[in-house]
Amino acid sequence: MAIEEKRLILKYTDQPGYTNDIDCYIKHGGYEDLKKAFKMKPEDICEEVLQSGVRGRGGAGFPAGMKWKFLDRKSGKPIYLICNADESEPGTFKDRQIIHKDPHQ
């Protein structure tokens, strides 16, 4: 009996006609969750990310929502989210595949 695969990452990349440009991503529902996030309070976004179980991919698997809760929003300084796609581990190409095949995801 085959196990059905449910992709969360690279979800559409094998579909005919899918490309890595932004228009194609939007056509497949991309950025809908971002629109939702713009209507939410920062603490609610952090809580949703925490409840989702999303973890860092740096080896320690630290909960992303917990890390986001550590940000000092009262400082008045800008807050930036940075994507680190450096692959320092020999033989791993996960970040490269995501950035090349579905960069907007």
Describe each PLM feature range.
Residues 1-105:
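Feature of Fe-S/electron-transfer and energy-metabolism proteins
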